[in-house]
Amino acid sequence: MRVVFDTNIYVSALAIPGGKAEEAYLEAIRGAFELFTSVAILTETAAVLQNKFDWEQERVRNAIQAIGQSATVLRPRPTLHLLQDEPDNRILECALEAHANHIVSGDRHLLALRQHEGTTILSLAAFLAELKP
């Protein structure tokens, strides 16, 4: 299974230890599925951790490097303008390039799509339920 996490999943996994987002991220590290991300997603994640959570640069850098080691990092060209929030379009582009089965997100605009070009867009709870038989 090929999966793309939205920025909000990474931020929750890193900033809220012991939560469901961290559980999903740890499943990726364990190899339960193939995790894909992009430079744009990592850049946005770094900005949120630094600006909203006051993480120091070195802590942010370490977190982004850890994600980069557990996920395949892609560089899709920004071509989509389907959603008003441009970072949401970067998530869709990453999923397209990864040929992802799922996008996992807490973003209502992405979740409202439900599916895009063969990729199912799931909430974190729905994704975790799918992982557990």
Where are the predicted features?
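Acidic, PIN/NYN-like endoribonuclease modules and their adjacent C-terminal/linker elements
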Residues: 85, 96, 108-133
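Short, well-structured N-terminal submotif of metal-dependent ribonuclease cores
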Residues: 1-37
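Short, active-site-adjacent cap segments at secondary-structure transitions
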Residues: 10-11, 43, 110-112
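Amphipathic coiled-coil/heptad-repeat helices and related helical stalk/stem segments
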Residues: 20-21, 60, 87-88
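PIN-domain endoribonuclease scaffold, especially VapC-family toxins
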Residues: 27-82
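Active-site neighborhoods of divalent-metal-dependent phosphate/nucleic-acid chemistry enzymes
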Residues: 69-103, 108
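A secondary-structure boundary/capping signal
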Residues: 5-7, 37-38, 106-107, 123-124
